[in-house]
Amino acid sequence: VTASQPTLQRARGRARVGFKRRGDQTVLADLHQSGCAKLRLPRRSKDAPGEAVIINTSGGLTDGDHFDVTAHWAEGARATVTTQAAERVYRSRGGDARIDNRLEVAANAAALWLPQETILFDGGRFQRTLKIDLADVAAHLLACESIVFGRGAMGETVHAGHVFDRWRVRVAGELVFADGFELSDDQDIPQLQLDRPAVAEGARAIATAIVIAPAMHWLGATCAWG
């Protein structure tokens, strides 16, 4: 008789943060946190941009876990959203962990989305979606997401696992950037796929970064985040 795997408690985290302009300062406009998702707001000088730090108190993600973050920048707001530490995706029993992030940036706002890297451990599986909506061409964005395949300094390798990373960026409702990266052991050992020139050419970390800002800033003017 084959025993079925027990049903385990899964981690659920949801966070929402919003920033607005008050005079010449950026202040908090909205804050919600539930489950394993927590937000911290570091102390800063009055004229400094806003900042929110995301914390996953579960210590990492595995199959069936779901982490959801929404961030909003009102008109003229300037703020950075980052994480306290690298996210960790641990060995799965078969399913995928899910990470869903949504950013909404109003006109003349400056949004920096700069989480630390996501570390995929051997056997880890996750799907991540980042949806970004900029109100118009006057909105500013700097966003970066990165994935590390095993901790090289610890001698770790990734022989099995699955990654699906999906970006969708819209400006005034128009799709301006769409990207999807998938790596799965259904095709080959992930480490061997990363060795291929068209994939990572032997690298064990990848990153996607995007900057959207009015063209005048590339002509020498100071950008909204300094």
Place the predicted regions along the sequence by residue.
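Internal, conserved structured core segments that host functional sites
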Residues: G95-H159
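N-terminal, charged/glycine-rich beta-strand/loop interface patches
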Residues: V1-E117, D122
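Residue-level recognition of well-ordered beta-strand positions that form the cores
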Residues: G18, V53, T70-H72, R102-E104, ...
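Short beta-strand/loop motifs in extracellular/secreted proteins, especially
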Residues: A77, A139, D165
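Solvent-exposed residues in well-ordered beta-strands and their adjoining turns
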Residues: G18-R22, A74, A106, D133-A135, ...
